[in-house]
């Protein structure tokens, strides 16, 4: 039995390390990750990559930490407390990326979940341009799960190909985007469709109405899995993306298989979002999200019950999806 496994067996308690930036408002970054891990009864450790000055209105300052300090934090955590799951969030500059990659190899981390932090929900750029190719070169080979929204995924592919990918006009275009990312290394690619609305013909529409729909998608290199849902016109809640990837990592730390871990994390985040009052102020929405996530953890893991028609493989994508779209 490997050291990571023996540690978890000995303590009988799942552990997870998050490597990300600090959000002083508590709604995103390291602070969000640790809240979600606690809700899943996972022991969370943290390595700061940057200090940020931010809240629900925007970011006023990003201060990257020196790579040597990032390395010393990782060593302090993983030389003492063994774990096999690492979640990676904000990486503001490329200098720290080789350090993180070397640490993942040194400590034999098997389950790495990356949250694409290129642009914040408020539209702030969160990393230097050279960070993207450095991430693909050094970190993508380690990834079990890469999670992003459609907009950030498009930017990542654009920077990788050094040219704009085909324009996104339809559902199959989103699938093509995911398959390109999968070929870069991650075993599972997760795209949240919050920013994209589809009409009944599976075309992307810029004028969504009550019949518009969206979907969160998972691609494992063989099949696409679709979590179809009504399109929500409200903007993202500060901390949504961090919470999703922290939930995936927490589920993995609890020995839930990857596809199920992703599926249940998507469900718990969506469950929590539905319980946020739409007329609340932005800061209070984040607070409500984490409160709801604390309750949704009751339904996570093997206890969660999902409607099979909302989570389907791509056996007959068009006919199955159209059967669920209002006519």
From Swiss-Prot:
Keyword terms, alphabetized: ATP-binding, Cytoplasm, Kinase, Nucleotide-binding, Nucleus, Thiamine biosynthesis, Transferase
Pathway membership, UniProt: Cofactor biosynthesis; thiamine diphosphate biosynthesis; 4-amino-2-methyl-5-diphosphomethylpyrimidine from 5-amino-1-(5-phospho-D-ribosyl)imidazole: step 2/3; Cofactor biosynthesis; thiamine diphosphate biosynthesis; 4-amino-2-methyl-5-diphosphomethylpyrimidine from 5-amino-1-(5-phospho-D-ribosyl)imidazole: step 3/3
Question: Which residues of this UniProt protein bind 4-amino-5-hydroxymethyl-2-methylpyrimidine?
Answer: 54
**Record's catalysed reaction(s):** 4-amino-5-hydroxymethyl-2-methylpyrimidine + ATP = 4-amino-2-methyl-5-(phosphooxymethyl)pyrimidine + ADP + H(+); 4-amino-2-methyl-5-(phosphooxymethyl)pyrimidine + ATP = 4-amino-2-methyl-5-(diphosphooxymethyl)pyrimidine + ADP
Q: Which Pfam families match?
A: Phos_pyr_kin (PF08543)
GO molecular function term, any single one: ATP binding
A Gene Ontology annotation in the biological process aspect, one of them, is:
thiamine biosynthetic process
Cellular component (GO) terms are: cytosol; nucleus
InterPro entries attached to this UniProt entry: HMP/HMP-P_kinase_dom (IPR004399), PM/HMP-P_kinase-1 (IPR013749), Ribokinase-like (IPR029056)
Q: What is its EC number?
A: 2.7.1.49, 2.7.4.7
- Subcellular location(s) per record: Cytoplasm; Nucleus
Check the record and name the SUPFAM superfamilies matching this protein: Ribokinase-like
Tell me the function of this protein. Answer: Catalyzes the phosphorylation of hydroxymethylpyrimidine phosphate (HMP-P) to HMP-PP, and of HMP to HMP-P.
Q: Which family does the UniProt entry place this protein in?
A: Belongs to the ThiD family.
Which named protein is this? Putative hydroxymethylpyrimidine/phosphomethylpyrimidine kinase C18B5.05c
């Amino acid at each position: 039995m490997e050291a990571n496994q023996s540690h978890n067996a000995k303590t009988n308690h799942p552990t997870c390390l998050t490597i990300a930036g600090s959000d002083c408002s508590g709604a995103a970054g390291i602070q969000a990750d640790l809240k979600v891990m606690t809700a899943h009864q996972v022991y969370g450790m943290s390595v700061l990559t940057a200090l940020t000055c931010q809240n629900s209105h925007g970011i006023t300052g990003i201060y990257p930490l020196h790579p040597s300090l990032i390395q010393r934090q990782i060593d302090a955590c993983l030389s003492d407390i063994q774990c096999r799951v690492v979640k990676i969030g904000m990486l503001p500059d490329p200098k720290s990326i080789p350090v993180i990659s070397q640490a993942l190899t040194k400590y034999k981390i098997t389950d790495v979940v990356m949250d694409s932090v290129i642009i914040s929900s408020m539209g702030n750029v969160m990393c230097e341009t050279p960070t993207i190719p450095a991430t693909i070169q050094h970190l993508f080979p380690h990834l079990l799960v890469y999670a992003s929204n459609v907009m950030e995924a498009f930017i990542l592919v654009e920077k990788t190909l050094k040219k704009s990918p085909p324009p996104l006009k339809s559902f199959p275009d989103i699938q093509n985007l995911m398959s390109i990312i999968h070929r870069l290394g991650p075993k599972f690619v997760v795209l949240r469709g919050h920013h994209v609305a589809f009409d009944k013909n599976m075309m992307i529409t810029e004028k969504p109405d009550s019949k518009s729909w969206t979907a969160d998608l998972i691609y494992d290199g063989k099949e696409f899995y679709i979590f179809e849902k009504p399109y929500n016109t409200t903007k993202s809640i500060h901390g949504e993306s961090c919470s999703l990837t922290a939930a995936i990592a927490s589920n993995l730390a609890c020995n839930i298989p990857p596809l199920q871990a992703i599926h249940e994390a998507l469900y718990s985040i969506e469950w929590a979002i539905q319980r946020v009052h739409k007329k609340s102020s932005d800061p209070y929405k984040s607070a409500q999200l984490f409160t709801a996530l604390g309750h949704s953890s009751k339904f996570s893991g093997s206890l969660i019950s999902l409607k099979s028609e909302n989570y389907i493989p791509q056996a007959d994508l068009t006919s199955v999806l159209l059967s669920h779209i209002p006519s």
